[in-house]
Each structure stands twice: as C-alpha cells, then as structure tokens.
From Swiss-Prot:
It comes from the Bacteria. Its EC number is 2.7.2.3. One of its GO terms (molecular function) is ADP binding. PANTHER family: PHOSPHOGLYCERATE KINASE (PTHR11406), PHOSPHOGLYCERATE KINASE 1, CHLOROPLASTIC-RELATED (PTHR11406:SF23). GO terms for biological process: gluconeogenesis; glycolytic process. Its main location: cytoplasm. It holds the Pfam family PGK. The keyword Kinase applies. Monomer. The gene is pgk. InterPro entries: Phosphoglycerate_kinase, Phosphoglycerate_kinase_CS, Phosphoglycerate_kinase_N, Phosphoglycerate_kinase_sf. This is Phosphoglycerate kinase. Transmembrane segments: none annotated. Keywords: ATP-binding, Cytoplasm, Glycolysis, Kinase, Nucleotide-binding, Transferase.
Length: 396
C-alpha cells in the first residue's frame, strides 16, 4: 500500500486536523527548552496554511496522571507560544481537545488560521483508543493528517483510531520523510551497509539485531549490551552490567551473524570505572578482558578507531543506541566519536531516534546527518519490521 501524502489533497477551506508531536521538554518556568519537534512539523503546518485550510493541531505532552496540577504543568500553552513565534502568526490555544467550546472555535476558525487543541492525554480515552472519543475528534475534521512519527507505533485515538471516521487522510511531510529514509536505509541500502548498535540491554535490541543481521554487512556493538556478548564468548568483564539470562541468546545472535557472514564487531578495549559515576577514576583497559573491580562504561580508543574505519568505508550507516554512559563526560568519547565519524561520512547516515538522536544533538552535528529520526520507539519498531498503526492509517 502506498502512503498518501498531504500534498496530494485539496485542502482549501477544509478543516484539516494535523496530529503533531509537540511532546517537548519544558523548564521549571514552563518554557520550551528544545523546540526541535515543533520545528520538524513546520513544513506540514505551513503547507496547510498556504493551502488556505482551517488548521487544527493536536498533540500530547508528558504523561498526565489525572492529578489536579497536571493541567497547569502539562498544558500545551508553551508550545503554542513557540509555534506562534516560528510561524509569525497567532496560534489560538483551545482549553480542551473535545467539547462544545472546541467545536465553536473550529466553526469560527478562518482559512489559513491555526488552532492548537489542548493536551490530548488529559483524556484517558486518547491512549485507550476509545471509539467514542475518536469519533468526537473526527467530528472536528474534514481531513486527518498524521505528522507525529514519534507516536506512530501507538494505536491511540488521535494517531490511528479517528482516521476510520474521517473521509480524507494522509501523512504529513515528516512522517513521509521518516518512512522513506528508514525504508530506504533498511530496504535497499547502498553497500557496504554498516549498523552501529548500542544501549544497555541485548533484550531491548533482539528484534533490531535479528533484522540487521539479515541486511547489514557489518554490525558494530557498543554500550553495556556489548558486555553480555563478550561474556557469552568467555571473556571476563569484571563487574560490568551483564544480562546473565541472555547469554545463550547472545551466543545464538553471534552464531547467526557468522552463518550469514556478517561482521559483528565487539569492543577490543574499554574505558572503565569502579562505578558508573562522573567522579569515578577513568581507567583505559587496553584489552578485551576487564579486570575484577572495574566495569566497562564506554568503548576504548582502539575500538572507536575500528568503528570509525567501518563508518568511513560504508555507503550506508544506521545508528541506534549509545556506545557508553555518554550523559557523563568521562564516558562520552565513544558515543560522540561515532557521531562525529558519521557526520564526516559521505554515506547515507541515518540516526534511529532516542539516545543516539540526543547525542547527535549534543554534539551539534544534526545538520551533517542525512536523517535523524524523530521517533525513538517508532523507529525501533520500524527497524524490527513491525507495522506502525499511525503509518498504516495514512495508506491509500
């Protein structure tokens, strides 16, 4: 099924409901500290404005638990203020996302004007994909557009449910870009195709690794998950984080990679500490084996060099998961080193959301990447080969 996109529709004079992802971080004063997700939705919003649509935006923010101060702490007002600045036009903020007051605001909305509904998750029915709630949202719209890739793996009322009750539906430009880039990187990659996979647990990345073993030429492993693989090979790892119940699974993954002639590279040296703290002494262990009393907290310099060489020779590089505890400076060189190597590469470079996207942002090299995914869980599920409800709902 082909993805129908917003530019294929006539939007003039229509009520266009765009599901965006404005789940942005706020400071204690309630100001937006990182507007990347708002900026990512601008091409779709601007297209709808220029097409003279009545633009209705909807998003969630945080995880409201029905507490009295939720409405104050998790209001979308800061997002409305920032969006208004970015668009250089007024953005009306509704005090709810359903109800008579919202219906009146939609009725009064002029062509080319923008209304932002209040936090969808103030209603528990949103995450339950409640049919009555989905129908109520759908009653506000002639056209439904999904431009929230970050929640595309969730079958919620606004991300999938309401699409059944709206005549016209489409993907926004951000969802289109995500599906095209991730699909191309994994479906028909230019070779050599190198994957960099990190993070704490093998169990979190089983499906990702299985899918990549079927497609990649080489997989470079970092992060705490590497110690489970090393221990599975009989290498001492000191007091590093290991998933003891996943050692057999790690062996099977290594065997599968070998059988398919995929180079699965593990660290050959490590940056270690006695504990995972910024104040711990930084010890470079120039060997695969980690001594007792130390834990691996980052890949070592030799390993980083090996991974850099693989990145430099690749035509496609996909990265998901940090190489170490990069949030703390002593253990950040491996992660930032990989990020910089990817930025310097002429290859198609795709960063698969979550912590790796945060690392690229911190390194200040987002623009050097061909694609940085806005979806953490969504990009992982896409890579695992799963169907995303929020994408399927946009198909013709």
């Amino acid at each position: 099924m082909a993805l129908r996109t917003i530019d294929a529709l006539d939007l003039a004079g229509k009520r266009v409901f765009i599901r965006v992802d404005f789940n942005v971080p706020l400071d204690p004063q309630g100001r937006v500290t990182d507007d990347a997700r708002i900026r990512a939705a601008l091409p779709t919003i601007r297209h709808a404005i220029q097409a003279k649509a009545k633009v209705i935006l909807a998003s969630h923010l945080g995880r409201p638990k029905g507490k009295p101060d939720d409405r104050q702490k998790l209001t979308l007002e800061p997002a409305a203020v920032r969006l208004s600045e970015l668009l250089s036009q007024d953005v009306i903020l509704a005090d709810d996302c359903v109800g008579d007051g919202v219906k009146k605001l939609v009725r009064d909305l002029k062509d080319g004007h923008v209304l932002l509904l209040e936090n969808l998750r103030f209603h528990p029915e949103e995450e339950k994909n409640d049919e009555a709630f989905a129908r109520e949202l759908a009653s506000l719209a002639d056209v439904w557009v999904n431009d929230a890739f970050g929640t595309a793996h969730r079958a919620h009322a606004s991300t999938a449910g309401m699409a059944r009750f709206v005549k016209e539906k489409a993907a926004g430009f951000l969802v289109q870009k995500e599906v095209e880039y991730l699909g191309k990187a994994l479906g028909s990659p230019a070779r050599p195709f190198v994957a960099i996979v990190g993070g704490a647990k093998v169990s979190d990345k089983i499906k990702v690794l299985e899918n990549l073993i079927a497609k990649a030429d080489a997989i470079c492993v970092g992060g705490a998950m590497a110690y489970t693989f090393l221990k599975a090979q009989g290498v001492p790892v000191g007091k590093s984080l290991v998933e003891e119940d996943k050692l057999e699974l790690a062996r099977q993954i290594l065997e599968r990679a070998e059988a398919r002639k995929v180079d699965l590279l593990l660290p050959v040296d490590h940056v270690c500490g006695a504990e995972p703290k910024e104040t711990a002494e930084r010890v470079v262990v120039n060997d695969r084996a980690i001594p007792d009393g130390l834990m691996g907290l980052d890949i070592g310099p030799k390993t980083l060099d090996r991974y850099r060489q693989r990145i430099a020779a690749a035509k496609t590089v996909f990265w998901n998961g940090p190489m170490g505890l990069f949030e703390q400076k002593p253990w950040s060189e491996g992660t930032f080193g990989v990020a910089k190597a990817m930025a310097a590469s002429p290859a198609v470079t795709v960063v698969g959301g979550g912590d790796s996207a945060a690392a690229v942002e911190q390194a200040g090299i987002v623009d050097a990447m061909k694609h940085v995914s806005t979806g953490g869980g969504a990009s992982l599920e896409f890579i695992e080969g799963r169907e995303l409800p929020g994408v399927k709902a946009c198909e013709e």
